[in-house]
């Protein structure tokens, strides 16, 4: 079958033929319709330090997808041939304390689809049936293909009560923009997003944020004053991994504020801990999606009117995958869809 593989320990992704995956007793086989390129895939393409330490070569990559169930293992219940599915990219062990306690998103033995085992940039994908999620009929293939990153956004945004709150989102990548849209949709008052990438700030404006602030041109405290904010932000969502952005977020949080941290900063990042301690801030680390509460919330948010379509900016045939990676690497895109049909 056709697949995109990290074939060599150098920059790039290559299209090759690989054998179809084998179906286990508890697995489903999915014929891929559409995939989306994740920032993780760009890291793997670039072959940065993280990728060199993490990715075995060769490896079929990718973990954002939608497809159709075409084969079912003999032990599988609850799925049938023809079901339209996406899937949770974190495969958990099932036997650690968190898994047995129902907190599978905190499994200490997680294996990543397209990172530690073969991914979805292929004509067929096999995953445990536990990881598959049926897509409601009124959600399009394109939206279903971005459920994985949308789940990061939903998990981060819904970490805290948002109704009537003022929210700061630092980092206007696709996940940050989707998180901001979720905050606004569920009843936050002011939702402000910051970045230095004007293309993506304009995407955020299309998604309905209160203010999209280019911090290289505007002062965030001036924006807060314009909005009539007399105190700091109640909720902060750090999506950028940029030390300067995180420090600004801490500086502008209200006392008792709550911070969800999804962006991965450098290991040696220094912050002013006085901002955390004397403000009584609560900081929560976020990884992945809650299984499967986040997934159900994703579906119902879209069904209740949340419009994510502006975040999908480019579409390519899988044969033109290089164009997709080039536009993702440029930073001048939202989500990029690769069509396998």
Curated annotation (Swiss-Prot):
Places the protein is found: Cytoplasm
Residue positions binding Zn(2+) 1: 38, 63-64
One protein family per Pfam: ADH_N
Subunit structure comment from the entry: Homotetramer.
Protein name: L-threonine 3-dehydrogenase
The protein's Enzyme Commission number: 1.1.1.103
SMART domains documented for this protein: PKS_ER
Annotated GO CC locations: cytoplasm
Positions of the record's site feature: Important for catalytic activity for the proton relay mechanism but does not participate directly in the coordination of zinc atom: 148
Annotated organism of origin: Photorhabdus laumondii subsp. laumondii (strain DSM 15139 / CIP 105565 / TT01)
Gene: tdh
The keyword Oxidoreductase belongs to this UniProt entry's keyword annotation: yes
Residues bound to Zn(2+) 2: 93, 96, 99, 107
